[in-house]
């Protein structure tokens, strides 16, 4: 019995990287964990862990969706004086690509930390119009298109979808076969 992937959820200001490394090493040596990752860590926090763990961090799970993508917004607004140009995550997406760390998107249908789901939300009429149009074109649901949007990014982002609804899970799984064009993205 083992865990495929064990994540450290959220950074800890009092974390001692050497202690984490020792725990990682023990769990891996005992065959209890196959791989390690983090959630919501910036590049320097990952560097601290990787220095102590000899590069054990294989995954960084971040909040990411078509309606919540500040890591992309910051890159598109370089040298522009607006809020979207503020780099709040240390270029985590680019960093993970450079270091071959898999990015996983949690809450792929959410538009903020606690605000809710953007699909069908009155706050996102234009986005929902596009999602519905593309869903019809690709014979799927808006959820499927939202996941296809994430999968289209060249970083190879994986989505974490929590659902008890088999139909939703089936629709989301079909997103792997949808390749949005640049214009659709």
Give, region by region, the residue ranges found by the protein language model:
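Beta/alpha (TIM)-barrel catalytic core signal, keyed to glycine-rich beta->alpha loops juxtaposed to Asp/Glu
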Residues: 11-185
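Acidic/hydrophobic-patterned starts of short beta strands in beta-sheet-rich repeat architectures
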Residues: 5-6, 37
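Phosphate/pyrophosphate-binding loops at sites that engage ATP/ADP/AMP, CoA/4′-phosphopantetheine
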Residues: 1
């Amino acid at each position: 019995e083992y865990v495929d992937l064990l994540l450290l959820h959220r950074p800890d200001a009092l974390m001692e990287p050497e202690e984490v490394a020792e725990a990682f090493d023990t769990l891996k040596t005992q065959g209890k964990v196959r791989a390690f990752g983090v959630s919501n860590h910036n590049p320097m926090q990952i560097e601290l862990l990787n220095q102590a763990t000899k590069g054990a961090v294989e995954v960084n799970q971040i909040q990411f969706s078509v309606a919540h993508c500040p890591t992309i917004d910051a890159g598109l607004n370089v040298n522009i004086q607006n809020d979207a140009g503020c780099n709040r995550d240390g270029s985590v997406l680019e960093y993970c690509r450079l270091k071959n760390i898999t990015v996983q998107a949690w809450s792929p249908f959410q538009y903020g930390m606690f605000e809710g789901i953007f699909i069908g939300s009155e706050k996102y009429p234009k986005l929902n119009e596009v999602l519905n149009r593309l869903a019809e074109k690709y014979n799927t649901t808006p959820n499927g298109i939202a996941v296809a949007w994430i999968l289209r990014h060249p970083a190879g982002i994986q989505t974490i979808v929590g659902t008890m609804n088999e139909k939703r899970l089936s629709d989301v799984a079909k997103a792997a076969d949808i390749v949005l064009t640049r214009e659709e993205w």
